[in-house]
Amino acid sequence: MAAKQTEPVTIISLRKLSQAAPEPQQKETKTFTVEDAVETIGFGRFHIALFLIMGSTGVVEAMEIMLIAVVSPVIRCEWQLENWQVAFVTTMVFFGYMVSSILFGLLADRYGRWKILLLSFLWGAYFSLLTSFSPSYIWFVFLRTMVGCGVSGHAQGLIIKTEFLPTKYRGYMLPLSQVFWLAGSLLIISMASVVIPTIGWRWLIRIASIPGIILIMAFKFIPESARFNVSTGNTQAALNTLESIAKMNRSVMPEGQLVEPILEKRGRFADLLDSKYLRTTLQIWIIWLGISFAYYGVILASAELLERDLVCGSKSESEPEVVETTGDSGEGLSPCYCHIFAPSDYRTMIISTLGEIALNPLNILGINFLGRRLSLSITMGCTALFFLLLNICTSSAGLIGFLFMLRALVAANFNTIYIYTAEVYPTPMRAIGMGTSGSLCRIGAMVAPFISQVLMSASFLGALCLFSSVCVVCAISAFTLPIETKGRALQQIK
């Protein structure tokens, strides 16, 4: 048998072999987004600290807003104010809030949430302290308007919380922020019951400024939003923030490289009116306006009911007599209803305020299982009903019960629309979306004092029907919102 000949191995044959062999494929570099990192890191110690510090912004905001309700009877007497003048104070506070909300929203989308939050707190604390030295009614109105401008920036705290929370925790943690608003409301009412009768309303304002000053020092522990940093091209800062959070939570980062989306123009008002978001934006604005109108209407109506006892047109046994005081001009006597809240009045306000937390468990279940739209529609419809029930002649216990439920419902409304607005817009326009919504809703807050403190004195049923009708419109708008955000990841780009 002939032996098989083998070809000699040459350079040419090796070259042919190498050309025939497939080239090894390069491995694709793994990438991840901020959303991936937030979900991978999960919930932990950082988020608890974030919840406590950013949630405390609600304490400060509630104290500054509720302060007007407890101080109104005192300044009415001290400066001999008419009903419309008392209502005008609240209106101007919300006018300042409205003007600054859009400005702070634009600035936050361009320069960062953290910087604007800090600026708003410094502004608010400064002018709040100055208010306590107001020599006249005009100065008081002007300085409280400046406080309203500062308070409008506190919404950036909610945005920072929203952008750091994993998707499945947003529907649970964000409604719990209502606890801080409740704490602020209870704190200012309790302080007023002790401070006003002893050392006066000016010291109440000074003491109420302290929590905001303390909170400013705690902001250094909270970083700028990683989503904002990525949207502005500052990927390294976002990566450093996410790594710090992972370390604090004793968790891990996703493998790969953090990628940034296509850079777009940020913070443009026109984006809210783009065809993709036009219907959503318009309906959100209607809902915000109506919720604010109802919420502050309930708060101011509660104080007015207690101060003037308007239920069924009756007069309470404890109603003080009308005190006649001589004006500076000496031309005659001006009536001044010097009704300083009695201890029982403060107790009623505290009980009704506690209602703000009563429906929180049901509200959390509703927005997580029924969805944001249906849950909001139901609570708005119930709010309309309970406004009408206030017209029923009842005992003081019955009145407290109705006010309790109304405060619970309007608080649930605010919870849901805050969450929905923060979730429905993408990162480049989230702050301007929240800012414009917060600004327009103050129109409702500006009108509410004149309904609760002026129209209600002339036509109690007419005022209640107006509040109820607005709530019905909001319920319909909520039910027909085009986008449901339950279980939906935050959108990073438009």
Swiss-Prot record:
Any GO CC annotation of this UniProt entry: membrane
Alphabetized GO MF terms: transmembrane transporter activity
Listed transmembrane segments: 48-68, 86-106, 121-141, 179-199, 203-223, 281-301, 350-370, 385-405, 431-451, 460-480
Membrane topology listed for this record: Multi-pass membrane protein
Cellular compartments annotated: Membrane
Principal location listed in the UniProt entry: membrane
Family to which this protein belongs: Belongs to the major facilitator superfamily.
PANTHER family, A to Z: SVOP LIKE (PTHR23511:SF45), SYNAPTIC VESICLE GLYCOPROTEIN 2 (PTHR23511)
Protein name: Putative transporter SVOPL
Organism: Mus musculus
